[in-house]
Amino acid sequence: MFREKLRREIEIIKNNGLYRFLRKKDDGVLDFSSNDYLCLSKHPEVIEAVKEGLKYGAGSTGSRLTSGNINHQRLEEKIAEFKETERTLVYSSGYATNVGVISALCKKGDLILSDKLNHASIIDGCKLSKADVLIYNHCDVEHLTNLIEENWGKYNNLFIVTDGVFSMDGDIAPLRDLKKIADEFNAILIIDDAHGTGVLGDGRGTLKHFNLKPSDNIVQIGTLSKAIGGLGGFVCGIEEVVEYLINTSRSFIFSTALPPHVVEGCIKAFEIIEKTDIVKKLQKNIKIANKVFKKYEFIKEDNLTPIYPFIFKEKTMEIAEHLIKNNIFCVGIRYPTVPKGLERIRVSINVGHEKEDFELLCERIKEVYSSD
């Protein structure tokens, strides 16, 4: 009975053209799907640090509050220094960080104002928080202000929650404006900088990109699985925020800690970002990609981040399959990850790509797609 019910549901998903399946990325393909923007996951120094970290064992064997607190505080100290903030807390994943931080800090009687295009982990954290949630139009400062003014005085606390860099479009939140609004209305600004850390502001993220300094009303969230090339997530803020989360954040308290060898790799990754020009190399590659992609008319304006949405709508999955058949790994993104009518090939570039790689990608796409 249960099996048949699930089969019917899966068939509906297939009939609607929304069926997902797991695909193995073959060796030797040209990869435009990875979030490993700085290629640190394969950096020799990072790999060596991971090997050295195996002296602690293959796993952490418990949560941070039991047997799992091994070398994690060294990583937290490194991130806090890197992000120029008081303190950092490391979680087992970026998803767990957003869910755990938002659901712990935001409570019944509070109001969350969340950007329309925020990541699913933010949306889930808002749902778990028991706070009221209002969605403001994407990066629309005027709409956000109007919502706050309409609800002023009705709630105990106000939280503005936004991605720093939006994962599907690669655009940047207007943090300078959001910070002004947070200051004016005594709100807390929570920034998920998963795609900004290691990319913008000399690698220190979106806040640094706008020359903004950490403050008491800013909570920064990040991931260790994208530009850092490892696994896990983190939250940065004032001392009291971290102390509170250690005691109340369920996804921190009840999750097994990151494996210690992964922690060592992440520490080394931050050191590489600090001591080399690897972030500048990424920014140089973004400028090269901008020229190529504009030449082929896949973008109209220059990007500041390594995420490029090529909107192909109903042709998206056909193009994605064509690319894979030609040894280019670049996945199609469709509803419900993105709105209907905005299906796209999400192109992620990294420091390892060459101009010729961008040209090849565009040529292969042109074989099945014409903008005319």
From Swiss-Prot:
GO molecular function per UniProt: 8-amino-7-oxononanoate synthase activity; pyridoxal phosphate binding
UniProt modified residues of type N6-(pyridoxal phosphate)lysine: 226
Reaction it catalyzes: 6-carboxyhexanoyl-[ACP] + L-alanine + H(+) = (8S)-8-amino-7-oxononanoate + holo-[ACP] + CO2
Pfam families (UniProt xref): Aminotran_1_2 (PF00155)
Enzyme class, UniProt record, top EC level: transferase
InterPro entries hit by this protein: Aminotrans_II_pyridoxalP_BS, Aminotransferase_I/II_large, AON_synthase_class-II, AONS_Archaea/Proteobacteria, PyrdxlP-dep_Trfase, PyrdxlP-dep_Trfase_major, PyrdxlP-dep_Trfase_small
Involved pathway(s): Cofactor biosynthesis; biotin biosynthesis
Protein name: Putative 8-amino-7-oxononanoate synthase
This protein's encoding gene: bioF
